[in-house]
Amino acid sequence: ELLQNSGNPCCDPVTCKPREGEHCISGPCCRNCKFKRAGTVCLDAKGDWMNNYCTGISSDCPRN
């Protein structure tokens, strides 16, 4: 994983964790090393499923 994230500007290549002052490295709720705002759609509705939204405190997309 270290090699995979070595070119990622959000990733500290030594620790493979977010650089100081950054929130995240990747994920559906991460953009430019920061968490997306709460309420940002991270998974569009399909069929009977409703949209899923970012929480503003995680790079993961919570499932409804």
Curated annotation (Swiss-Prot):
Disulfide bonds join C10-C33, C24-C30, C29-C54, C42-C61. One of its GO terms (molecular function) is toxin activity. The keyword Phosphoprotein does not apply. Expressed by the venom gland. GO terms for cellular component: extracellular region. Its main location: secreted. Keywords: Cell adhesion impairing toxin, Disulfide bond, Hemostasis impairing toxin, Platelet aggregation inhibiting toxin, Secreted, Toxin. It holds the Pfam family Disintegrin. This is Disintegrin VB7B.
